[in-house]
Each structure stands twice: as structure tokens, then as C-alpha cells.
């Protein structure tokens, strides 16, 4: 759906009017996010910046590019989606990120960090070639500047001098504490001997002036302070303005006017407060970055915490248990210590934990080097972000067969974050790489055993995946067993057809097994466990069964059924195999159960499909 109409007239000369608009937007964001969940604190903090952008620029002539775009809620509200905003992150509702198919005002799809400047450079090149008026305007957070792609784009932009405005929304906090030398270097400039000596001399001179002009000392000091952090960007050929107050509409608008007139690359450094306007969230950065539904008055979650551990918790608890006994274990993550559960390792063993910032490629390559030196790096990473490091996996880990351990969180359909965050690709691209061992647990107990197996596996890289939230298989349905390289586990032998589950697909297959049993159809159930190497005894295991049905939460192309069919082909075995994996399209956002139902992957739909394949009807 394309939403064309705007709902607000924004006069850059009417600051009081713009302040009312900002308050209206904040109220709406709080109203909807408290009901639906979403990215709250960054969206609240960026309101004045976005209102100012819209007040001065036509975003269809000057494309607005939102880095990651989780902070773009105010933009959505200003571009015809005020009423429909109530459907934010809901199935078939508005996306939580910018999405061109949703609105003509959303220039580019976003969800992963640090791409905005690169996109902007591409737009600027195209505008130059077309001799088009206008310039790209990128809004990016301080966490975004820790990624290599930001510097790659900045390097070209500074050299070619394309007209472009970048607004650095500096709220002093990305999802977790910002990591890296740049932010430290900028702050060190303020503390360096040249700056300190110069400031001391200036203050000494100004102190001799009459008291009536003493205010000059503080004003001069502040002015010098504003110039200093820009040295880094100025040396790259980027005009730097700031820091400015990112909640002062007058200051933002005047600065944007100046940047517009320069017709060169400009970085505006705006300091904001995450959670601005909602006292409970102000200053509590990580807790309020991404939230579920909550009570607006108290800030308390509307969802009670499950007594069952999440897969992330089961993983992190086991890793911590092993780390107590094995000093060679180290934890590595790319700006997601809390999300991946590695924050527990930070607290217990800070010297053995490495947050490399938004630098997935560096995470994998540096981990490979640690593995070469005899350490056991557990790289804890979301499936959707692992794809950013594919070359490092191939070139730096697998060619030399270095035993890094990839703990792939949020594998499968993740729900409300949608296309940019679904964890559906890792199975297909990892199984194409020589020397990679790939396996998956079916529940929390086997996940713990997967971590133990990975810790002991020292001959090659290995990867194991687990879902967000919870496994489909309830705890205790099957006795947990340890992992043995390349061995599957036949959980139920009796039946004429065989249901094969991989990872979270075991739980899905088990539910179908129970549903078919009610139809007097007995099914055997196999937990494949290892995708690579696949069980060499698989041909004997499947021999008694007429048909095979494969369940796994990854893309069908290059997926689990493909691996099984390749194996059978090499063995010259003809056996009907039907895949219940994900179809070849990007999967929309929404409640996971509703998304699965729309794909025909709920228990009822799967049961009907098998009945139909068997020539029976429900």
C-alpha cells in the first residue's frame, strides 16, 4: 500500500507550532508502542530531528535515509500513517522499519545498521549523473559509526565532495555501550595536551579582563569545545557542525539551513536523549531500546516472564558453566551482548569477553585468529547479522579449518521485525562451505548439549542454531542425549512414513505426528541433528518408510530437504521427499504464529498437506 498524504503542515518559522507537533508525535509513539511493543527510546529521542528535516526539506526530492530505521517512527507519523500507526509491527500492518512498498516517502529498506551513508553516496552519484536537484539526507545513530561500511562510504564521500547532509544522532548509547577507538579518540581530543594547554592559556588571559566580560571565557571555551571533535571528519573532507542540542528546534533548523547552503558533504553532530519525553525511559538506554507491550503509567511489562528459560538463556548459562572450568573459552559478539546472553560472561570474566561493536566481519576474522592461538571463541550472533560476515567465515575460518564456534541466535522466523531480521539464510549458505560442521538442537536440554559438543569439537569450525523466544518442542517430551559427530536420533521408529525434523523443526514435526495419530496414521520421527556431515547411516534409517517429510525453519532452496536429496542421489536411492521449509520469498513481519499460518506451516495446515499427499482428506 502506498500512502501519499501528509497529516501535518510544518512551518520552520513557527517553533511553538513545531513543538506542539513533537509532543503529538511523542504521545502517539508512546500510545502505540506501549500496546504493540517496538523500538521506543531511539524513536522518542529523534523526534525533533525528524520534524526539522520535514519542515525544511521535501523528502521526495531530498531522500531521507534512516540508518537501521528503527528511529523513524516520527517520519511514519508525518507521512500519512498517523491513524494506521496503531498497526505497527502487527501482521499485515505497518513495518517497524522504513519500507518503500509501504509508503512513497520511505526511500530505502532498512533494518541493519550503518548502511545510510553508503546509500546516500549512491543517491548523490545518481543525482550528479542525472543533474537532478536535491541532496540525500541521512539520519544515523552513534552506534552506526562503529561499522566499517560507514568509513568506506565516508572515505569516498570526502574525496568526491558530493552534496549530502548526515545527521549523527548522538545519544551516547547504541543498543549496548558503544565500543571502539573512534568515540574514545574524539573524547580524548578534548583531554589532550594541546587542547588543555590552549584552554588554560586562554582562560588565564581572559581572567585579566573586567568582570563584565568574564562570560567570554565560558563562551570561548564552549566554542573551542565544539570545534575539536570535528577534526576527524574535517580531515576526511567532511564539513562538521556541532555538537548541537538535538531537541532544540531552532538550533536544528538553523544548522540544517547552513548545511543546505554549503552544497558539500556535511555532518551535523546532534546530541539527544534516548527516551526523551517519557521519564521512566530517559537515561535507561538498553532496557528501553526494544520493548514488548508495557503499562504506560508504570513502565512494567504486560507480559509475565516465562518460567521456562529462553534458548538464549539456556545457551548463555551453559557457556558460563563451561567457562568456569575452561579458561580457553572466550565470548565474542558484535554489539549485542545482552541480546545474545553474553552479558553474563562480561560480569563473570570481563577479560574473556569481546564486544567488537557493529563489525561482524571483524568478529569472525579475529575469532579465527584466537582459535589459531588455541582459544575457543564462541561467536554469539543473530542469524540475520551473520550473513554480513560470510567472506570471513569462508576465507579466515573455513579454509584453514580453525575451530571457531558459531552460536546462531534468532534462527528461523523472528516475528515482528520482519524481512530484514528473519533468520532463514544461514542453513543454505553455511552448508555450501567446506570444513564447516553444522548441527541444531531440538529443545533447551539438547541446546545445552550442543554447546558442550561445540566446546569439545576442535578440528574445524562449527555452527549451531536456535530460535528466538522458545522451541516448538516442549521440554521433557523426549529424553535429552549428547551429540556425536554426524549422528541423527530416531525418536520414534514405528510408522509407514517418516517425519524428519531439524532443530526447531523437530517440535513442528512432533505436533504433526500427534495430529496424524488422531487420524489413525502412525508416523516415525527422526531428529536429523547434523546437517553437515549428514548421518552416513541415513539410507538404512529411512529404508523402512514409504515417504519422507522434512521440517525446518529455513529457506527451502539449499536447505535441509536439499541436503537429504543430495545424499540420497549419491546413494542411488529413490524415495519421495516433501519439504516443509520456507518458500522462496522474503517473509513479512507479524506475530510468529500468524506468519507461520500464512505460510502453511501451522500444525493444521501441515497435517492437511500430508493427508492430501497420502490421498486422504481431513
Task: Map each language-model feature to its residues.
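Conserved short loop/turn motifs at secondary-structure junctions
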Residues: 35-39, 140-144, 242-249, 381-386, ...
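Thiamine diphosphate
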Residues: 87-118, 129-133, 159-287, 301-318, ...
Amino acid at each position: 500500500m502506498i500512502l501519499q498524504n501528509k497529516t501535518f503542515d510544518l512551518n520552520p518559522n513557527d517553533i511553538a507550532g513545531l513543538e506542539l507537533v513533537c509532543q503529538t508525535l511523542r504521545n502517539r509513539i508512546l500510545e502505540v508502542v506501549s500496546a504493540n511493543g517496538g523500538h521506543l527510546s531511539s524513536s522518542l529521542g529523534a523526534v525533533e530531528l525528524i520534524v526539522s528535516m520535514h519542515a525544511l526539506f521535501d523528502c521526495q526530492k531530498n531522500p531521507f535515509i534512516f540508518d537501521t530505521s528503527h528511529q523513524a517512527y516520527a517520519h511514519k507519523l508525518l507521512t500519512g500513517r498517523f491513524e494506521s500507526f496503531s498497526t505497527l509491527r502487527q501482521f499485515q500492518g505497518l513495518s517497524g522499519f522504513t519500507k518503500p512498498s509501504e509508503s512513497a516517502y520511505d526511500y530505502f529498506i532498512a533494518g541493519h545498521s550503518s548502511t545510510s551513508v553508503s546509500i546516500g553516496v549512491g543517491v548523490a552519484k545518481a543525482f550528479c549523473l542525472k543533474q537532478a536537484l536535491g541532496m540525500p539526507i541521512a539520519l544515523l545513530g552513534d552506534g552506526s559509526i562503529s561499522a566499517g561500511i560507514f568509513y568506506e562510504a565516508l572515505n569516498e564521500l570526502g574525496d568526491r565532495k558530493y552534496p549530502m547532509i548526515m545527521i549523527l544522532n548522538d545519544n551516547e548509547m547504541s543498543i549496548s555501550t558503544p565500543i571502539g577507538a573512534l568515540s574514545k579518540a574524539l573524547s580524548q581530543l578534548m583531554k589532550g595536551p594541546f587542547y588543555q594547554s590552549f584552554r588554560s592559556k586562554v582562560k588565564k588571559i581572559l581572567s585579566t579582563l573586567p568582570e563584565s566580560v568574564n562570560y567570554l571565557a565560558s563562551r570561548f571555551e564552549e566554542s573551542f569545545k565544539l570545534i575539536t571533535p570535528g577534526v576527524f571528519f574535517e580531515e576526511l573532507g567532511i564539513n562538521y557542525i556541532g555538537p548541537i542540542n538535538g531537541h532544540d528546534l531552532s538550533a536544528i533548523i538553523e544548522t540544517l539551513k547552513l548545511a543546505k547552503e554549503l552544497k558539500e558533504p556535511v555532518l551535523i553532530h546532534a546530541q539527544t536523549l534516548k527516551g526523551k519525553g517519557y521519564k521512566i525511559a530517559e537515561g535507561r538506554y538498553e532496557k528501553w531500546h526494544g520493548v514488548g507491550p508495557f503499562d504506560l503509567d508504570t513502565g512494567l511489562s504486560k507480559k509475565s516472564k516465562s518460567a521456562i528459560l529462553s534458548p538464549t538463556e539456556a545457551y548463555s548459562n551453559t557457556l558460563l558453566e563451561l567457562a568456569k572450568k575452561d579458561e580457553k573459552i572466550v565470548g565474542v559478539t558484535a554489539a549485542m551482548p545482552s541480546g545474545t546472553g553474553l552479558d553474563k560472561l562480561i560480569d563473570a570474566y570481563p577479560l574473556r569477553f569481546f564486544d567488537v561493536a557493529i563489525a561482524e566481519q571483524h568478529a569472525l576474522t579475529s575469532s579465527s585468529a584466537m582459535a589459531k592461538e588455541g582459544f575457543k571463541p564462541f561467536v554469539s550472533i543473530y542469524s540475520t547479522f551473520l550473513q554480513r560476515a560470510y567472506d570471513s567465515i569462508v576465507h579466515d575460518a573455513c579454509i584453514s579449518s580453525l575451530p571457531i564456534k558459531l552460536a546462531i541466535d534468532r534462527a528461523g522466523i523472528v516475528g515482528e521485525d520482519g524481512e530484514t531480521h528473519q533468520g532463514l539464510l544461514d542453513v543454505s549458505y553455511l552448508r555450501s562451505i567446506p570444513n564447516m560442521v553444522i548441527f541444531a538442537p531440538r529443545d533447551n536440554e539438547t541446546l545445552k548439549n550442543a554447546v558442550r559438543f561445540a566446546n569439545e569439537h576442535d578440528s574445524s569450525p562449527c555452527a549451531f542454531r536456535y530460535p528466538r523466544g522458545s522451541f516448538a518442542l516442549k521440554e521433557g517430551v523426549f529424553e535429552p542425549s549428547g551429540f556425536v559427530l554426524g549422528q541423527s536420533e530416531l525418536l520414534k521408529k514405528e510408522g509407514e512414513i517418516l517425519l524428519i525434523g531439524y532443530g526447531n523443526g523437530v517440535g513442528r514435526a512432533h505436533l504433526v505426528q500427534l495430529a496424524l495419530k488422531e487420524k489413525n496414521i502412525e508416523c516415525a520421527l527422526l531428529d536429523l541433528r547434523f546437517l553437515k556431515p549428514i548421518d552416513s547411516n541415513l539410507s538404512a534409517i529411512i529404508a523402512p518408510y514409504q515417504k519422507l517429510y522434512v521440517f525446518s525453519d529455513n529457506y527451502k532452496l539449499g536447505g535441509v530437504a536439499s541436503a537429504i536429496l543430495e545424499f540420497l542421489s549419491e546413494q542411488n536411492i529413490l524415495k519421495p521427499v516433501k519439504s516443509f521449509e520456507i518458500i522462496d520469498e522474503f517473509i513479512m513481519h507479524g506475530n510468529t504464529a500468524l506468519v507461520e499460518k500464512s505460510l502453511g506451516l501451522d500444525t493444521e495446515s501441515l497435517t492437511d498437506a500430508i493427508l492430501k499427499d497420502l490421498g486422504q482428506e481431513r
